[in-house]
């Protein structure tokens, strides 16, 4: 019995020591990796081009790029804007459900001047 416990402990230590670094398998995913939800991505944007397309982590939208203000499902057709930008566009309940509320990323500080 003691030998089994020692073997189990050694096995657990070996698995814990061999665990990958900061690059994740389920969370902390880099751009281009397959994702199921935006919370898995370092960039916080999991995007797919079509409803049947494979979703991948990608960078957030830059200024004057198409964007989605929010998603109900955690996967975007267009990523939200980078920090400091706002997604200006039409918003509707149907668009929120179908994930088609698109806009353009604008710098609100620059547009007020």
Curated annotation (Swiss-Prot):
Q: Which residues form the propeptide?
A: 19-23
Cellular component terms per the entry's GO annotation: extracellular region
Q: What GO biological process terms does the UniProt entry carry, in alphabetical order?
A: digestion; lipid catabolic process; response to bacterium; retinoid metabolic process
Please state the protein's primary subcellular location. Answer: secreted
Signal sequence, renumbered to the chain? 1-18
Q: Write down the InterPro entries for this protein, in alphabetical order.
A: CLPS_chr (IPR047576), Colipase (IPR001981), Colipase_C (IPR017914), Colipase_CS (IPR017915), Colipase_N (IPR017913)
Extract the Pfam families matched here. Answer: Colipase, Colipase_C
Is Magnesium set as a keyword in this record?
A: no
Quote the function comment for this protein.
Colipase is a cofactor of pancreatic lipase. It allows the lipase to anchor itself to the lipid-water interface. Without colipase the enzyme is washed off by bile salts, which have an inhibitory effect on the lipase.
Q: How does it assemble?
A: Forms a 1:1 stoichiometric complex with pancreatic lipase.
Report the PANTHER family cross-referenced here.
COLIPASE
Q: How is this protein named in the record?
A: Colipase
Q: What is the scientific name of the source organism?
A: Mus musculus (Mouse)
